[in-house]
Amino acid sequence: PWRLGADFFFRNLLDGDPASNTLGWRWVGGLHTRGKPYHAQAWNIAKFTNNRFNPGSADLAEVVEGLEGEEPDGLPGVSPPRMPDNPDPRRPTVLLVTEEDCRPEDFDLSRLNLAGCATLTASHLRSPLAVSPLVEEFEREALKDAALRSNLDTTELRAGVPADLARWASRAGATQIATPFIPTGPLRDWMLDAKPALDEAGIRVVEWRRDWDEAIWPLATAGFFK
């Protein structure tokens, strides 16, 4: 059942994040925070639903059991952070902007041989079910704002057939796609699906990561209660 809650939130949160959303709901079920599942409180539900829901004490379980039995082998080992790479300034390059990072101007674009730019809408990848129109509008407007700030002629792409990414880059005459770092999540999965066509076309994808992310992310090894 926690997956249904996670899916509902992810489809409706304007700033939905695959990591915090998934981990938050796993905390509710006591999966990442083993032995400490979320214990629903009537006052909390009433307060944060503005009394639209006001359960009595008899409506809620007095004893809460976690879902550890669903994953008896425990948590997987900690994986090392995926390392970013630097774009090759000699290669014709296209800039790809996604909802994962709408500030490409934080990186030094002037040293690149830019042949084009595109925004990529991907919020529809969050779920097999329909994503809220407000989420799609939020993403669309954020990407539009990022494109205006880039001062580049920008193509609007939608994450559909993964091979289309290679076709767009090839039409622009590029052999390199530069994009701010895309963490684990639906968009990362889509980019992996696009990789065979990109490899076949001789196009490399390079992801930037900010220096402070580089310094801080390896230290993020604890959970809610550690």
Q: In which residue ranges do the predicted regions lie?
A:
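Trp/Phe/Arg-rich N-terminal binding region typifying the photolyase-homology
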Residues: F8-N12, L60-K226
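Active-site-proximal binding-pocket segments
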Residues: P1-P81, D85-R91
